[in-house]
Amino acid sequence: MRKSKNVVPYGISAIARRFARKSRALPAEAWSQWWKTLAVGLGLSSLIVYGITRLAMGWEAQGLQAWDEKWLLIMRDYNPLSFSQGITWQSPGNLVGMLPVFFTLTALTAWFKEPLVAATTVATYIGQFALVWLSWGTWSRDRPDLIANGIAAPSLHSFPSGHVVVVMTMYGLIFYLWFRTSDSWLERGLVIVFATLWIGLVSLSRLALGAHWPSDVIAGLFMGLLWLITVTTALQRATHVCHKTHPKSRVNQPQ
């Protein structure tokens, strides 16, 4: 009689074995370039994020708070998303919406023998948390209560918007992978349009709900872009090493 297997542990084990096997097949220099780029990028990003947070703290009483209040009320009246639509569109940026995307992308890229992409996915997710928590630990800014009496705004950590950072980094990585894989300029154009709309609508949802000040969202977009540039640069440099070493390998080379 065939011995039964627990599907989830067996699947995770199989994915891990594939990842390990393919990882060992890559040039050591590729992983070295990947790690070094991430380490330097994380250090620089952390310094920039800390600096931006300290600047925003200093500017709060010098006009930033008044500017935020003015523009949040303007966005309340002119935001293309209603409050109820904001509830829907903020979902891709929360844990419930993002974790399945993260685990699926990591599992698929590991299973289909793209260890650099799988590792970059993990680094992207963990790194964005590190940067957000660095800023939150530096400044626990109060959330707005100007829309619906602040019903959709938790009490702490307004700057930056964590939803916006995670959407910019994780979905930004997905759109980047799609863009670099396509040979069609028309498709690449569609990727840019779709990425702009997707990230933009999630960002606007946080303002529609009154969950963040406008400067929180702007800072989230910038910090997320900073980390996205870091991880995609690390992936590009490592992929370039693989391509030089094994020109005919399956490593996904940017066009």
Question: Residue locations for each model-derived region?
Answer:
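N-terminal transmembrane-helix/juxtamembrane module of multi-pass inner/ER membrane proteins
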Residues: 1-97, 139-152
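Aromatic-anchored segments of alpha-helical transmembrane domains
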Residues: 51, 126-133, 197-206
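Membrane-interface loops
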Residues: 66, 102, 106-185, 190
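Short hydrophobic alpha-helical membrane-embedded segments
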Residues: 93-100, 192-197
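Membrane-embedded catalytic cores of phosphoryl/pyrophosphoryl-handling enzymes
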Residues: 148-255
